Structures are given as C-alpha cells and as structure tokens.
Design a protein with these regions (language model features):
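The feature captures the beta-strand-to-loop junction immediately N-terminal to the Walker
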Residues: 33-38
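Helix-to-loop junction immediately C-terminal to a conserved catalytic motif
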Residues: 51
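Conserved ABC transporter NBD signature motif
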Residues: 58-72
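ABC-family P-loop ATPase nucleotide-binding domains
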Residues: 82-137
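Catalytic Walker B motif of ABC-type/P-loop ATPase nucleotide-binding domains
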Residues: 149-153, 158
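ABC ATPase "signature
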Residues: 208-209
Length: 234
C-alpha cells in the first residue's frame, strides 16, 4: 500500500487554545477517511493544515512523503466549507482560474461534471443558489487529477437535490479509488463509503480506525456511534 497521508502527534495551537491535539493517523491510497465531530472539534483546522493554509505547532505531517508546502499544494485538491469564488465571476471565469492555476486541471472532467451538476458555463456566481455554488465548487475540486481530495462539509446546508448530486459525485470518486478526506455531520448520508473514521472532540481523537471494525466492535452504525459519542453536543 502507498501511504498518502501520515500524521504523528500533530498539534495546532492558537495562542492558549489547542485546536488539534496530538493527532496520529495514516491514510492509504484509494481510502476514504471520514473526519467526524461537532462544531469546534478541530475538523476544519486539520483540513487546513493538510491544504497548507495553516502551519502546525508541533508533531509531524506528510503528504506523499512531503511536508505541507508549495509542492503538496499541487497534490491536494481542497474544498473549503464556504464559497471561495468571486461574485463577479462567471462559471467560465472560475474554470479559467483553475485551469491557469492548477496544472492537473482536467477540462474534459470539468465538462462532464458540469453536465452531471446541471450547470451552465455562462452563469454568474452571484446568480447561483447555495446548492448550485456548492455543486460548482465540487465540480472544480474533482476536475483536478490530485493525489488527495479534501472536502470540508461538502453537503452541509444545501437543498436535497443538490445534496444528492454532490453525494453521487463523491461516491463515484470513491468507487474510482480516489483518496478522499471528508468532514461532515450528516453521517448517515455518506458513511457507507468510509474506509476509515476519526472522531474528534476538542482537537483530540477519541475514536479512530477502520470503519467496518468500528461497526463490528460497537455493534452499531457509524452514525449511531457519532450520536452516542457526541450526545448533548449536537
């Protein structure tokens, strides 16, 4: 197996607040990792460190054997938890931005994703609903030939139709053996594609491992485990 992501005692502090606390895990090529927890548990901080947007405080993290930096930004396709495109853009401008900025951008994949998501290349970003914006962001993310896809709450707060389209796209990539990290609180919708899970609380991993082994050991689904671990917090 090829290790795509490895962390050892990964820690991130903001002043006196510890957002990520001694996180240790590995993700192999072709695996899907679910990063689960309530708001403020450290999920987004973890993803931003992987994406090279935040620097670790201590510990180790490597992506394909490299520490996060300019080189790994070319390996990681990151979908943040909020829209990152300028309102004045058309979808075609967003495509051009990705094509110019990312050498691994695959325009044929983007055209197919646009058809799947039922989006028009001439639409303005400012005219898109939240669900349509998220579909576009997912289309751009998956149009890169990246080593690792990192998705922060890709189905949160969107309408059911958009959620289904986004889920189908994620599931298709999982079946294609793409390496994916997903944060979500909508566990039921997506847990079947998880190979591994890590449950975070106050930045610490309170449960981590193979998803099927967690189900078998606890005698319940990943969603039920989520509800049990975070009862009173969600």
């Amino acid at each position: 197996m090829t290790t795509i992501l490895r962390t050892t005692n990964l820690t991130k502090k903001y002043g006196s607040k510890t957002a990520l606390d001694n996180l240790t895990l590995e993700l192999q090529k072709g695996e899907v990792l679910g990063v689960l927890g309530p708001n403020g548990s450290g999920k987004t901080t973890f993803l931003k460190i992987i994406a090279g947007m935040h620097k670790k405080t201590s510990g180790e993290i490597t992506i394909c054997g490299e520490e996060p930096g300019i080189k790994t930004k070319g390996m990681v396709s990151y979908l943040p938890d909020r829209n990152f495109l300028y309102k004045w853009m058309k979808i075609s401008d967003a495509r051009d931005f990705y094509r110019d900025f990312f050498p691994d951008f695959n325009e044929q994949s983007f055209v197919k994703m646009m058809e799947v998501m039922n989006l028009d290349i001439n639409q303005k970003i400012s005219s898109l609903s939240k669900g349509m914006q998220e579909k576009l962001n997912v289309a751009l993310c998956f149009s890169r030939e990246a080593k690792l896809y990192v998705l922060d709450e890709p189905i949160g707060g969107v309408d059911p139709l958009a959620r289904d389209m986004i889920l189908d796209s994620i599931i298709d990539r999982a079946y294609d053996k793409k390496t994916i990290i997903i944060t979500t609180q909508l566990v039921r919708d997506i847990e079947n594609i998880f190979d591994r899970c890590v449950f975070l609380s106050d930045g610490r991993a309170i449960l981590s491992g193979n998803a099927e082994e967690i189900r078998n050991e606890r005698g319940m689904s990943i969603e039920e485990t989520f509800k049990e671990l975070y009862r009173g917090q969600i």
